Structure formats: C-alpha cells, structure tokens
Design a protein with these regions (language model features):
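Short, hydrophobic/amphipathic alpha-helical patches that form generic packing surfaces
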Residues: 14-25, 89-97, 157-161, 208-215
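Long, compositionally biased intrinsically disordered terminal regions
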Residues: 167, 178-179, 198-278
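A generic structural motif
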Residues: 30-41, 169-177, 191-192
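Acidic, Ser/Thr-rich peripheral helices and adjacent loops at domain boundaries
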Residues: 49-54, 185-198
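Internal, well-folded beta-alpha domain core
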Residues: 101-190
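Charged, alpha-helical interface segments at or near domain boundaries
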Residues: 33-126
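N-terminal ordered "arm"
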Residues: 1-52
Length: 282
C-alpha cells in the first residue's frame, strides 16, 4: 500500500476526524501532521476538514471501549511527544482490533511511549504550579511560561480555584496560547504574539522585594547549585522573577497624559466563552 499522509488543522477535533476518515475510506496512514508542521513531500497527502460531529463519534467510540484509553488519548495529544498523532492513531487501531487489555502493559510499544510522555507532562505541570510568577498589571494578574508540553489545561483548575476572586492570565510562549480567567469563567485561546508591558512603580518595587528576599534567605556556605537545579530546573528560570536581570525591575515612565496598557485589552472581560478543542478541561 502506498504511503499516505493526512494533514489537519492542529486541533484535537481535527485529529479525531483524521481517524474517522481513515476508517471511512479503509486507509492505513503513514503519518498525520498539522498544517503548521506540514512540509512538502512526494507522498500522497490529503487535507482533512474538521467536523465536530465526526470527532465526537470517534471519541465516544474510544471512551466506550476504555475510559482509560479516552484519558490517554486526550492527554497524549497535549504532550510534546514527536509524531504523537500517528502513535495515538496506532493506539486507537489496536484498541479497536484487540480490545483494551494491552493498555495495562507498560511495556507495550503501542502505548509505552505515550504513557511516558504523559508522565513527563504531568511532572512539568506539577512543577509549574509552584514556578508560575504573577505580576499585578493594572489590576490583572499576569504571568508567562515556556513549557515543553501544552500544560494550560492541566493548570486550569488549580489556578482558577486558587485565584477564584481574581482576574488573571497565563500566557504560554511555546504554544502561543493563553489561559484567561475572570468572574468565575475561564478559557484557553490562541494568542500568536504577546509581550507583557513594563510594570508600574509599585509592581516594580514588589518584584525587587521578592528577588531580594530570595537572595537574602540563601545561606552562602550551604549553596548547592546541582541540588537547586534538580529541584528547580534551569529551563524554568527564564520566566521566574527571582532570576530576572535589572530591566525586569525598572518601572515604565508615563509620557504626558498617555495611559500605559499594563494588560492587553480584553483579558479582564467577565464573559469569556469556553474554548473548544484540545485545551478543554482535562
């Protein structure tokens, strides 16, 4: 059988539609790639349109065969696992053909790399619950993160319950999407470009106080860089207040009567619609 590639819009529903189409057309796929990652190839390639009804049919089928498989499918799609789409597709094919028993085998090649990636993603989300640093941006709490995996759905319930009475956002630089929360409503939505504005004088002083506190409580004679990087991996430092350079603590200077946009327009809007797709609550 000639190699066949399906291309889709990058959403969870779009991926499920690829699975639906492959069964409807009786085709076995070589690869499934998002339109963002697609590169021209000599192989036969077909673009699959997203149809929510078809996507729901596939997910309901998987969930009816195994609730665990449904959770693995949804969380596996959020990982940074290379070629995750084709691996998840192969898992679904084996589930439909052989049943869910293989899911209990941690060494089965159809599920092991997916479970390994999910464990890594869960660990990353757990660390970020302690490493997220918010700034007060004109009444809105704002933060940025640079995760390997799409962890915003995993962080959603934690921060929405912890800051229930606040308005906040967490921007994922890596995947260019943002978690928005206000007045008991939350959404995860794409945001291609975003840069947090400089703080006002009060926020800058609080940032500096936090950095000084962090530096002061350290016991110089007991410094252990290796231990610190084990418990606080260096790849997270870029978005943590205590590791920023001097420019992070310099307040914005107003020019005339012009108002400074400390937070992007629209974040504090109370009526934020729920976002569909792979960013739905896990």
């Amino acid at each position: 059988m000639a190699p066949l590639i399906y291309c889709y819009d990058g959403s969870f529903e779009g991926f499920l539609c690829c699975v639906f189409e492959s069964y409807a057309k009786h085709e076995v796929l070589t690869a499934i790639v998002s339109d963002e990652d697609f590169e021209p190839t000599l192989y036969d390639t077909r673009y699959i349109q997203t149809d929510p009804e078809r996507a729901n049919r596939v997910y309901r089928k998987v969930f009816s065969l195994s609730q665990d498989a449904g959770q693995i499918l949804r969380r596996g799609f959020l990982t940074c696992l290379p070629q995750r789409e084709i691996l998840l597709y192969q898992m679904i094919r084996k589930l439909i053909k052989d049943g869910p028993r293989f899911l209990r085998s941690m060494t089965d090649p159809a599920v092991y790399p997916i479970l390994k990636a999910i464990r890594a993603m869960n660990g990353e989300a757990h660390l970020l619950k302690g490493f997220v640093r918010f700034s007060d941006l004109n009444g809105v709490l704002g933060s940025e993160i640079e995760p390997k995996n799409r962890v915003l759905p995993l962080l959603r319930s934690h921060f929405c319950s912890r800051y229930y009475n606040e308005t906040f956002f967490i921007y994922d630089r890596t995947h260019r999407e943002v978690l928005l929360y206000s007045a008991g409503k939350s959404a995860i939505t794409p945001l291609e470009q975003f840069e947090i504005a400089r703080p006002n004088a009060q926020e800058a002083s609080y940032r500096l106080l936090w950095k000084r506190f962090y530096d002061t409580i350290a016991i110089k004679e007991r410094e252990n860089p290796r231990c610190r990087m084990t418990n606080m991996p260096k790849r997270y430092w870029n978005t943590m207040t205590e590791f920023q350079n001097e420019s992070w603590f310099i307040p914005e200077t107003p020019h005339g009567d012009e108002a400074i946009p400390y937070a992007p327009a629209g974040i504090s809007a109370p009526e934020i619609p729920e976002a569909p797709g792979p960013s739905a609550p896990v």
